[in-house]
Curated annotation (Swiss-Prot):
Residues annotated as binding a divalent metal cation: D8, D9, S39, N91
NCBIfam families xrefs: PRK00346.1-3, PRK00346.1-4, surE
Keyword presence, Cell division: no
Descriptive protein name: 5'-nucleotidase SurE
Keyword S-adenosyl-L-methionine applies: no
Gene: surE
Keyword tags: Cytoplasm, Hydrolase, Metal-binding, Nucleotide-binding
Length: 248
């Protein structure tokens, strides 16, 4: 099996390089990642200019674009052949709950599903035990032949930032959600132009049993199956009753 590895923290990030180190022991790998940190890029594509993949070492390329650009180029065959699976990560920090809306890590996996490849997004809930997350992925791939998922599903995996021996196990979860983000922070500009940093993520709000937040807080690896169908099916019936009363 040949695996494409991507991320949003950039090619030089410890997370992606740790993942590559582990996966190449058992699999053929191709690493294609942004040339700098592109956290929060979500599913954006670079459409305003051409993008350039640059070979850094054998099997590793950096791209002056977004995580989605990287996967799009790799799976379109313009970089070094085809792959069987895409693993995005290891992200530096959690992608829990509604983090997935903004996450370039999750977006890279989502692009892979758009292009017909199975995909995993993996994040470490911290910045220390990347080996733990890599070992989890190795174990999941070892047993992946027994997994059957519907088309269009990707797995969002969050790993507690603890030594591997301290993991409690694995839980299949749903996405929780956070309180609204903190307010933008004013920044000093040398020319006096109003400038702001985007506010930090807020604290978790829905951390009830069964959520990804709850699982990782108890020391479990969280695996949430997600897809791109954002339809709220429960709202269709009342919405239809309302629109049926409207004449155009």
């Amino acid at each position: 099996m040949r695996i494409l590895i991507a991320n949003d923290d950039g090619l030089d990030a410890l997370g992606i390089q740790t993942l590559a180190k582990y996966l190449q022991r058992e699999y053929a790998i191709l690493v294609v990642a942004p040339d700098r940190n592109r956290s929060g890029a979500s599913n954006s594509l670079t459409l305003s200019r051409p993008i350039q993949p640059v070979k850094v070492v054998e099997g590793q390329y950096r791209v002056d674009g977004t995580p989605t650009d990287c996967v799009n180029l790799a799976l379109s065959g313009v970089i070094d052949g085809d792959v069987d699976l895409v693993v995005s990560g290891i992200n530096h920090g959690a992608n829990l709950g509604d983090d997935v809306i903004y996450s370039g890590t999750v977006a890279a996996a989502m692009e892979a599903r758009h292009l017909g490849r199975p995909a995993l997004a993996v994040s470490l809930v911290g910045n220390l035990h990347f080996d733990t997350a890599a070992k989890v992925i190795m174990q999941l791939l070892k047993d992946s032949h027994t997994l059957e998922l519907p088309a269009g599903i990707l797995l969002n995996i969050n790993v507690p930032d603890v030594p591997y021996s301290e993991l409690k196990g694995i839980q299949v979860t749903r996405l929780g959600y956070r309180h609204k983000a903190q307010a933008p922070i004013s920044a000093q500009h040398p020319k006096g132009i109003p400038s702001f940093w985007i506010g930090a993520l807020s604290e978790p709000h829905d951390v009830s049993e069964g959520t990804d937040f709850c699982a990782v807080s108890k020391g479990y690896v969280s695996i949430t199956p997600i897809h791109t169908d954002m339809t709220c099916y429960e709202a269709r019936s009342p919405l239809t009753k309302w629109t049926d009363t409207i004449t155009l």
